[in-house]
Amino acid sequence: MNRRDFIKSAAASAACASAGIAVPSSLSAANEAEKGWRWDKAACRFCGTGCGIMVATKDGKIVAVKGDPEAPVNRGLNCIKGYFNAKIMYGEDRITHPLLRVNEKGEFDKKGKFKQVSWKQAFDVMEAQFRKTYDELGPHGVGVLGSGQYTIPEGYAAVKLMKGGFRSNSIDPNARHCMASAVLGFMQVFGIDEPSGCFDDIELTDTVIAWGANMAEMHPILWARVSDRKLSDPDRVKVVNLSTYSTRTSNLADIEIIFAPSSDLAIWNYIAREIVYNHPEMIDEEFVKKHCVFTAGPVDIGYGLRPDIHHKKYAPSELDTAATEKSKVLSEAEGVTLSYLGLKAGDTLENKNAAKADAHWQITFEEFKKALAPYTLDFTAKVAKGDPNEDINEFKKKLKALADLYIEKNRKVVSFWTMGFNQHQRGTWVNEQAYMVHFLLGKQALPGSGAFSLTGQPSACGTAREVGTFVHRLPADMVVGNPKHREITEKLWKLPAGTLSGTPGSHYVKMMRDLEDGKVKFIWVQVNNPWQNTANANHWIKAAREMDNFIVVSDPYPGISAKVADLILPTAMIYEKWGAYGNAERRTQHWRQQVLPVGEAMPDIWQMLEFSKRFKLKDVWGEKKVNDKVTLPSVLEAAKAMGYSEEDTLFDVLFANEDAKKFSANDPIMENYDNTEVFGDSRKVIGSDGKEFKGYGFFIHKYLWEEYRKFGVGHGHDLADFDTYHRVRGLRWPVVDGKETQWRFNTKFDPYAKKAAPNDKFAFYGNKNAALPTGDLKGVKNQEKTPLANKAKIFFRPYMDPCEMPSKDYPFWLCTGRVLEHWHTGTMTMRVPELYRAVPEALCYMHEDDAKKLGVLQNEIVWVESRRGKVKARVDLKGRNKPPVGLVYVPFFDENVFINKVCLDATCPISKETDYKKCAVKIYKA
């Protein structure tokens, strides 16, 4: 039977069964093929949509995956990556044993070659190197680069081990690269993280506007829902795509707006100006007066580059861009947009507030209106038109039509965005601007209306953000810098007072810079690929390989970071372990372990717990110097008073305590399912102590979950209990009295809003205790703070140029991103034969006019070169992505087209998120 006949047979068999008709023998082939399969629900491994899938196993291997028809997110659909969840675990070069660089004697040697070693030898060397650095440099000399792909229990264990055990806040996720600007936007505007809306908005809205979000490829299941909504009422429902190049998302759009890089800042202000100056009657005055305040902040904040503009590690070609961190000469456009500060084109702006980039203060509506004045249609079109071949008047019509859609009375509008917004030198600003427009119109936190940040990774929300795996965060939106938050955390973790450090560690990009500077000498990488995914990669690879440090990479495959490492730990993949993810609409989903890990691979939780066994309280809870200004006190005496011994290990105190052991290994949820951490498994892996690992004997995942959820209950982040999630297809938090929340801050739907303002429609309770000084557009005039009392903030943020723009020597913009078929750096998907065949290499998408000028033809190889590095890539002039003249697009999934060697490591100064979307390059034939 061939594939087509099998599918026909399966369909016919299902139809007969539903009709109560006996299945003929000729139609039973599909049923026979599935004989002995066990199906169970799980979450997709890939993007932040959070699709539910069904996983089939037989004989200890995953044999099939399909969309879960009961999953409310995807309703049985999968995208092309989703259908290959089963195959990501079975690549030919899967790492199955620990690998250590050794010399001829079998001893660790940084210049040695990888050799298979035991888990015991791996941990022996890892422990020795960790102790060496910890003793030399203190808690912040060691670091963890984590992930928005951590399961929630993994992220929680990592935070507890690093911050509670080693007293180090130097743990940061790769979500710093993708969602930090959205996070800071939420925190600055709402005082609490994550979207107010949910995916139900798609079916309820009249208008979908995508800003820097190629949803057709990056969130294809959501785009299927958008397409369905559009087709259900094509005349009423409008779709707009705003991007710096044409994408598949434009295929459905009524309006496509190709804008110049960074000019989204100007476009948002134009829309706000249209509202305030030309349609003041459309301002929802009741909403704005009751629920909002107007704010502004400094503009002289730099670009997130190194503060030392003459740093010895910079190449001469990098110095011009590096200098902008200290000051820059204002352009003609900036002379207009910053005129409210008394500045003009040609002035030098000194970046004096880089260290206070997040500062802001309350202003009046009149000041806000004054700042919007320059953003006329003519000015904005001149700044924002991104396609040189487009007629300026046609572009103006599009901008006006865009504004009209937002402004139209009774029109519901959802604004979606992803990396085009977040990976931006003013990423926090542009997130704030989206809320600005929605607030002015009263179109936020309503069914079918709202500004909605889409998450890129499967648990950037559920783990990186909610758990707090950022250097400055703790669970449930708490921060290490707040003494009260540290106190709450110490009590929940049963730590002595003063254990936690109040000093944030090095964020993702700074950790790489600190590695290059010798300030960090031990990094443990988990569930991501930093040496491929971090911009200006040549610097960081050289630092890792040529300097005195030790890099541990937990990975299933030999990606770039694994190749850079000193020690590789083989890690279990998603369905080889128990886990949970949290998606972009605050939906939390759990799954069971379906199969045993390959070879001797072990789950990340196991790796962390085994490492924690090697450190006693006396090793890490004594007096510890963080930096020249901060020394952590010894808490050993306080620990003794709590019943601990200085001989207790971190494992004993943090993970195998009395509370943990209450969670039985005989839990019925585990019946007929493996749990490697709890029981060990039939592989009889020889563990980190040289003995067979037979399990911890208690339900570690359930313990971690139930302890973690205590942080959010009663604080607006309520999660359900462990058992509930195994019965349902996910729930959107806050989950109060067993009921999920669709729209936050709306008293009709959100119990926390209802509690905060029982007689009102809205309450932005994240700001219930917040207060701001007052001033004007130029700064603070009165330091006395005015309470916000459940109000959100409407920010004014000006247009500013990026720090590096095309020039005579580097005449093209470079933008990077993903493609539908591959995930991030391709570590998993490039090993799936079907996905590899579909897209075997990253291409350089270019406009035909540019190719003609360069004498380049379709499929020819070119060099893409910046001030930082260069790579070869094959030119595509006819593909899915269609850049305007002057811009090229190169995805980052292909390690053989290592585009992050070319990209600039500038970041948003507030969020510290890298801007991968704009730098200057030159193109020439290879």
Swiss-Prot record:
It is an enzyme of class 1 (oxidoreductase). InterPro entries: Asp_de-COase-like_dom_sf (IPR009010), CT_Nitrate-R-NapA-like (IPR041957), MoPterin_dinucl-bd_dom (IPR006657), Mopterin_OxRdtase (IPR006656), Mopterin_OxRdtase_4Fe-4S_dom (IPR006963), MopterinOxRdtase_cofactor_BS (IPR027467), Periplasm_NO3_reductase_lsu (IPR010051), Prok_molybdopt-oxidoreductase (IPR050123). Its EC number is 1.9.6.1. [4Fe-4S] cluster binds at C44, C47, C51, C79. One of its GO terms (cellular component) is nitrate reductase complex. Its cofactor is [4Fe-4S] cluster; Mo-bis(molybdopterin guanine dinucleotide). SUPFAM superfamilies: ADC-like (SSF50692), Formate dehydrogenase/DMSO reductase, domains 1-3 (SSF53706). It catalyses: 2 Fe(II)-[cytochrome] + nitrate + 2 H(+) = 2 Fe(III)-[cytochrome] + nitrite + H2O. Its main location: periplasm. Binds 1 [4Fe-4S] cluster. Binds 1 molybdenum-bis(molybdopterin guanine dinucleotide) (Mo-bis-MGD) cofactor per subunit. Keywords: 4Fe-4S, Electron transport, Iron, Iron-sulfur, Metal-binding, Molybdenum, Nitrate assimilation, Oxidoreductase, Periplasm, Signal, Transport. Mo-bis(molybdopterin guanine dinucleotide) binds at residues 81, 149, 174, 178, 211-218, 419, 423, 529, 554-555, 577, 604, 816-825, 900, 917. Residues 37-93 form the 4Fe-4S Mo/W bis-MGD-type domain. Pfam families: Molybdop_Fe4S4, Molybdopterin, Molydop_binding. Substrate binds at F892. It is found in: Periplasm. GO terms for biological process: Mo-molybdopterin cofactor biosynthetic process; nitrate assimilation. Residues 1-30 form the signal peptide. Predicted to be exported by the Tat system. The position of the signal peptide cleavage has not been experimentally proven. Belongs to the prokaryotic molybdopterin-containing oxidoreductase family. NasA/NapA/NarB subfamily. Catalytic subunit of the periplasmic nitrate reductase complex NapAB. Receives electrons from NapB and catalyzes the reduction of nitrate to nitrite. PANTHER family: PERIPLASMIC NITRATE REDUCTASE, RESPIRATORY NITRATE REDUCTASE. This is Periplasmic nitrate reductase. It comes from Campylobacter concisus (strain 13826).
